[in-house]
Swiss-Prot record:
Organism: Danio rerio
InterPro entries according to UniProt: NA-bd_OB-fold, RNA_pol_Rpb7-like_N_sf, Rpb7-like, Rpb7-like_N, S1_domain
Subunit structure: Component of the RNA polymerase II (Pol II) complex consisting of 12 subunits. RPB4 and RPB7 form a subcomplex that protrudes from the 10-subunit Pol II core complex.
Function per UniProt: DNA-dependent RNA polymerase catalyzes the transcription of DNA into RNA using the four ribonucleoside triphosphates as substrates. Component of RNA polymerase II which synthesizes mRNA precursors and many functional non-coding RNAs. Pol II is the central component of the basal RNA polymerase II transcription machinery. It is composed of mobile elements that move relative to each other. RPB7 is part of a subcomplex with RPB4 that binds to a pocket formed by RPB1, RPB2 and RPB6 at the base of the clamp element.
A cellular-component GO term for this protein: RNA polymerase II, core complex
Top-level taxonomy: Eukaryota, Metazoa, Chordata, Craniata, Vertebrata
GO biological process: nuclear-transcribed mRNA catabolic process; positive regulation of nuclear-transcribed mRNA poly(A) tail shortening; positive regulation of translational initiation; transcription by RNA polymerase II; transcription initiation at RNA polymerase II promoter
Main location: nucleus
PANTHER family reported for this sequence: DNA-DIRECTED RNA POLYMERASE II SUBUNIT RPB7, DNA-DIRECTED RNA POLYMERASE II, III
SUPFAM superfamilies: N-terminal, heterodimerisation domain of RBP7 (RpoE), Nucleic acid-binding proteins
Keyword Nucleus: yes
Protein name: DNA-directed RNA polymerase II subunit RPB7
Length: 172
């Protein structure tokens, strides 16, 4: 799920950037340090939308660096258990499917793939397919899955998915 939330970040700035473009430098550094990162609490920061406040800088004693507190709003992606999402298959093997849901990795065990779909190691590329070959899931295909669990680390989120519900599977 995508959310638009308020966040805070501290920017450490080297003295060589002090000058007429100081605030623009702080903004650019915020974009490069924050966008594309993941915090376990809020999820993946997709994009900074607005910068609400750049606080007064605090000089670091003995270093000359300045620490600027910045308050901003961003769009974040935070998946939850039970959510149905579209994903791209990145790897197919006998234990299951590995997929990517935007910046997040997701694994679908062969036990969470419908029983009428069998792994075919002899096809090129390897795939899961039905007996009548009506449905074939292989690398780079787009599938719809249900998230059945997530593991949140400090800088990453990993999900476990399933194709065992109605309307899940290959997106045509």
């Amino acid at each position: 799920m995508f959310y638009h939330i308020s966040l805070e970040h501290e920017i450490l700035l080297h003295p060589r950037y002090f000058g007429p473009n100081l605030l623009n430098t702080v903004k650019q550094k915020l974009f490069t340090e924050v966008e594309g990162t993941c915090t376990g609490k809020y999820g993946f920061v997709i994009a900074v939308t607005t910068i609400d406040n750049i606080g007064a800088g605090v000089i670091q004693p003995g270093r000359g660096f300045v620490l600027y507190p910045v308050k901003y709003k961003a769009i974040v992606f935070r998946p939850f258990k039970g959510e149905v999402v579209d994903a791209v298959v990145t790897q197919v093997n006998k234990v299951g499917l590995f997929t990517e849901i935007g910046p997040m990795s997701c694994f679908i065990s062969r036990h969470s793939i419908p029983s009428e779909m069998e792994f075919d190691p002899n096809s090129n590329p390897p795939c899961y397919k039905t007996v009548d070959e009506d449905v074939v899931i292989q690398q780079d295909d787009e599938i719809r899955l249900k998230i059945v669990g997530t593991r949140v680390d400090k800088n990453d989120i990993f999900a476990i998915g399933s194709l065992m519900d109605d309307y899940l599977g290959l997106v045509s």
